[in-house]
Each structure stands twice: as structure tokens, then as C-alpha cells.
Design a protein with these regions (language model features):
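Eukaryotic modular interaction domains in large regulatory/scaffold proteins
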Residues: 34-37, 53-54
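SH3-family beta-barrel domains
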Residues: 5-33, 46-50, 65, 85-88
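Short alpha-helix capping/helix-loop boundary micro-motifs
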Residues: 38-44
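Residue-level detector of functional hotspots within protein domains
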Residues: 18-20, 40, 58
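SH3/SH3-like beta-barrel superfamily modules
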Residues: 1-5, 45-87
Length: 88
């Protein structure tokens, strides 16, 4: 299952899953916080993703995100999948 599909828009009934890892997501906002852990209760790294395509290697549930948190392949940290669209 995916959190969202490119041609179908967001579907809040669907979830991202570790079974699908790794997968790519598109971020369309400039200031998506990168966090040190999976949740808004973890510290921000002080960096933002910017708009672009990113590879997610792990998914975890956590506070502040309905669809879960994705760990960036780059090692920069975790992003909320609520602001991502799966592209593959």
C-alpha cells in the first residue's frame, strides 16, 4: 500500500509500508523539516528537504504524522510522509 499515488492524489485511507522500502517520494514544499527521529517529539536537524525527489529506506509511525515517518536514504534524518507523494 502507498500513502499516495501520483495520478490519484492523496488517499488518507492508505499507508506507507516498510514492505515497499526502498521507494521514492516527491516533496512539493520548500520547508519540510528533517528530524533526528520518527516524530514531532524528536529534535529538528535544522535542515529542510526543499522541493525534490527523495528515497525512503524505512517507515515508522510516530507523533505528528498520520501516514508515518520516512527515513531518508541520505542519512539526513526523517521526514513526515504526510507531505510526500510516492512516485514509484
Amino acid at each position: 500500500m502507498y500513502g499516495a499515488e501520483v495520478d490519484g492524489g492523496n488517499d488518507s485511507d492508505m499507508e506507507f509500508s516498510n514492505v515497499d522500502c526502498p521507494f521514492m517520494v516527491k516533496v512539493d514544499i520548500d520547508d519540510l523539516n528533517i528530524r533526528k527521529g520518527a516524530g514531532t517529539n524528536t529534535a529538528k536537524t535544522g535542515r529542510y528537504t526543499g522541493k525534490g525527489v527523495f528515497t525512503i529506506i524505512q517507515v515508522k509511525s510516530g507523533s505528528g504524522s498520520t501516514l508515518g515517518w520516512g527515513k531518508l536514504k541520505s542519512g539526513a534524518g526523517w521526514i513526515s510522509l504526510d507531505y510526500c507523494v510516492r512516485i514509484n
